[in-house]
Amino acid sequence: PGLPVLELPAWDCLPYDRVSPGADAAARRLDALTAMIALVKRPHRAVILTTANALLQRIPPASLIEAQTFHARPGNQIDMNALVSRLETSGFERVPTVRGVGEFAVRGGILDLFAPGWTEALRLDFFGDTLESIRVFDAATQRTTGQRKSMALQAMSEVALTPETISRFRRSYIEAFGAPSRDDGLYAAVSEGRRFAGMEHWLPFFYERLETVFDYLPDTPVVFDHLAHEALAERHALILDHYE
C-alpha cells in the first residue's frame, strides 16, 4: 500500500505493422521508461505493471532514453530553434494549436508543448535566447492555470532521428536489402530526417543494441499471473506469423 505504480503498455499495433504506435501508448511507454531509469538512479520501491506483449518488446538503451530528457528553468539560455529541432527529432508533432500529448506549437517567442508524463501543457515564453517563464495552460481552453519553476522534457518516440541514428539506419538497411529504390519512402524519409509511418518497427536498425525491461531494472523480483506463460507463447507465435 502506498507504493507508486508504473504502467508500461505495449505498442497498440501489430508486429511489423505499417502504422506507428498511437501517441497515447507511445507517451505512456516513454513516461514509464523514464521513471524506471529514475528508480535505478535514486533507488526507491515501486510496482511496475506490464503485459506479456510489452515484456517481449526490445527497447532503446536506458542511457539513450535518459540523454533525450531535457531540463530547463526560467533564466536559462536556450536556443529556441535548437529546442524546436530537438522536439521534431524526438517524435513531437508540430501543430497550429496544442491540444494533446506529443504536440508543440510556435508563435513568435512563445513555444507551447504537451509532453509525456504531464497532466497539462506548458507555455514557454522566450525573450531572445532567455527562457523568461514556464506557464501551465489548459489545452482545451488555452488559458493559463499556473506557473512552473522548472520542467523535464521527455522524448515522444523510441526512435530519435539524430545524425547517428539516421546513419546507422541507412547502413543497416543497405546491408540487409541492398541499394534502395527511388520509390522507397521509408529510406528516403529517414535519410532526410523525416518521420515515416511504422518506422518504429525498424527499431534494431537505428541502434547498435537494444535492451529489455530486465536490463533497465536488474535483479528486480518478477511476479507472473497464472496465464502469463500462455500469453508470452501466443505473442511469440504472432510475431513469427507476421514476420513470415
Region spans (language model):
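ASCE RecA-like P-loop NTPase motor cores
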Residues: 1-244
